[in-house]
Regions:
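N-proximal low-complexity "stem/linker" segments adjacent to membrane-targeting elements
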Residues: 1-54
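Residue-level marker for beta-strand->alpha-helix junctions and adjacent short loops that shape enzyme
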Residues: 20-22, 82, 110-112
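Alpha-helical elements of Rossmann-like donor-binding domains used by nucleotide-donor carbohydrate transfer enzymes
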Residues: 30-33, 62, 91
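Conserved donor sugar-nucleotide recognition element shared by glycan-biosynthetic enzymes
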Residues: 56-60
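Active-site nucleotide-sugar/metal-binding loop of Leloir-type enzymes
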Residues: 61-74
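Short beta-strand-to-loop acidic/aromatic patch adjacent to the donor-nucleotide binding site
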Residues: 72-83
Length: 147
């Protein structure tokens, strides 16, 4: 990925994050990494935050209004407890540029809980007998809602 990459030529990214109880270190590290990497390739990025709004829906609506009132072309919602890679963000932008029908993209990430039933199944199947730390791969639980 270089500064002249056509996927980024007309892109102005807004990263929108509702923050209620503070941002996790992994989010802060990822956001700083994204800001630095975007600057290096000439991609304008703007970060917007809504602080201490107890309604996540209201916070996201407020951030959406900020996006619509801005000159940004791409909106990325990232919660303040999520780790992400700038490369994944750049890949999403490239896909959206290459495929205009992909105007809205999303990424799934696990809920903040351990799915003990999956962990127990993994133990029963012997999936982590060589390295018990591998059980972490089976602990996630996802909730996806499609409209």
């Amino acid at each position: 990925m270089i500064a002249t990459d056509p996927a980024f030529a007309n892109c102005r990214l807004m990263v929108a994050t509702p923050i209620y109880e503070g941002a996790q270190g992994t989010y802060v590290r990822a956001a700083l990494d994204l800001a630095l990497r975007a600057q290096a390739i000439g991609l304008p990025v703007r970060f917007e935050f809504i602080l201490y709004q107890p309604s996540i829906t209201r916070a996201r609506n407020m951030l959406t209004a900020m996006f619509l009132a801005s000159d940004c072309t791409h909106l990325l919602f990232v919660d303040a407890d999520i780790d992400f890679s700038p490369d994944d963000v750049f890949s999403l932008i490239e896909v959206m540029e290459a495929r205009p029908e992909c105007a809205v993209l999303g990424g799934a990430y696990p809920r903040r809980m351990i799915n003990w039933r999956n962990v127990a199944r993994a133990v029963e199947m012997g999936l982590a007998k060589d390295d018990p730390a591998d059980l972490a791969r089976y602990s996630g639980d996802f909730a996806l809602h499609f409209l």
